[in-house]
């Protein structure tokens, strides 16, 4: 947007155009720094080094709403499954914080042996809050982003969110995604 304004002014007011280009450059630097911070948050070192069971408590602790966490994983799923799972949890906790007006969140990560999904089964994530409910997939991009991310690994997402009754988000990810 700023560069477009600069292009319009370049012939009429080169000094103003230069100021706009400098502004755009600063905005680009700021966006890159924000992207680095987001990327670090989406795939932190603890996830890479120690796995989902170690990374989930870190994500839960960062959430301003108190989180009760249960991790029932006998071993590490695939790295891809862990990355998708961590993203799903972070996005779900962000949605709770922004929209749910919840006082608590329950987060369960568990392995489900499901022969129909291969011998390894599924990684199931369940995020339950006691908030206001009424989550609408048609509003915002958060839930769409989750569906897209899960769809890319043949996973699934269900959201149960009756108005006034909180929200239950359940994600299934192939263990060896």
Predicted regions, residues:
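Coiled-coil dimerization/phosphotransfer module
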Residues: 1-177
């Amino acid at each position: 947007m700023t560069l477009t304004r600069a292009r319009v002014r370049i012939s009429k007011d080169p000094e103003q155009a230069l100021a706009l280009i400098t502004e755009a450059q600063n905005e680009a630097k700021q966006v890159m720094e924000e992207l680095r911070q987001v990327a670090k948050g989406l795939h932190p070192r603890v996830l890479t080094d120690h796995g989902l069971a170690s990374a989930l408590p870190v994500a839960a602790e960062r959430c301003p709403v108190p989180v009760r966490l249960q991790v029932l994983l006998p071993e590490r799923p695939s790295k891809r499954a862990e990355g998708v799972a961590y993203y799903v949890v972070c996005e779900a906790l962000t949605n709770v914080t922004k929209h749910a007006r919840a006082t608590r969140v329950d987060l369960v990560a568990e392995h489900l042996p499901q022969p129909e999904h291969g011998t390894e089964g599924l990684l199931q994530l369940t995020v339950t809050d006691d908030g206001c409910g009424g989550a609408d997939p048609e509003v915002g991009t958060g839930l769409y982003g989750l569906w897209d991310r899960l769809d890319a690994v043949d996973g699934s997402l269900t959201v149960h969110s009756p108005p006034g009754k909180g929200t239950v988000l359940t994600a299934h990810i192939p263990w060896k995604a």
